């Protein structure tokens, strides 16, 4: 009998992109929320705020910083680690050892966008170690085509400057 996944867990490291935000006021949740906001935004877009909130309350969806994964064994789950280029080798090892029975993991990241102060990304390291192992796959996306880039730049210019003469 195939077991169903009981929950979806989304996580990412709490690493700032280039600039230091410094002290954040509030409780622990309000301190980590800014790092998790992109995950919340994506879920709101896919599910709608009300449906997302219901799934969160039922425990079907969990969004947590990577640091909260230590010590857990995650069975019957589908786990997504986002921005994995910003994990250290130690964090990546900790994350991968959370894998429990009937669990699938998806790890996303771009090794050209590392924000770590010590630029040894756990993502780049695991690819060298795990490449070629059965049931583990790595997918590399190609950069956007030059034609798309021109389209994007032109669309942005039109959007930005449209209406400037209306003043």
Predicted regions and their residues:
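Conserved helicase motor core of SF1/SF2 NTP-dependent helicases
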Residues: 1-81, 85-167
């Amino acid at each position: 009998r195939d077991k169903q996944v009981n929950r979806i867990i989304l996580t990412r490291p709490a690493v700032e992109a280039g600039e230091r935000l410094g002290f954040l006021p509030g409780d622990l949740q309000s301190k980590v929320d800014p790092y998790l906001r992109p995950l919340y935004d994506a879920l709101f877009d896919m599910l709608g705020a009300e449906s997302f909130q219901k799934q969160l309350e039922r425990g079907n969806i969990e969004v947590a910083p990577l640091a909260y994964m230590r010590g857990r064994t995650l069975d019957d789950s589908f786990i997504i680690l986002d921005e994995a280029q910003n994990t250290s080798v130690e964090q990546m090892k900790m994350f991968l050892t959370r894998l429990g029975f009937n669990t699938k993991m998806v790890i996303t990241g771009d090794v050209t966008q590392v924000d770590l102060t010590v630029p040894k990304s756990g993502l780049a390291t695991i690819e060298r170690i795990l490449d070629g192992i059965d049931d583990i796959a790595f997918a590399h996306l190609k950069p956007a085509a030059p034609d798309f880039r021109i389209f994007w730049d032109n669309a942005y210019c039109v959007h930005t400057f449209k209406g400037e003469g209306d003043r």
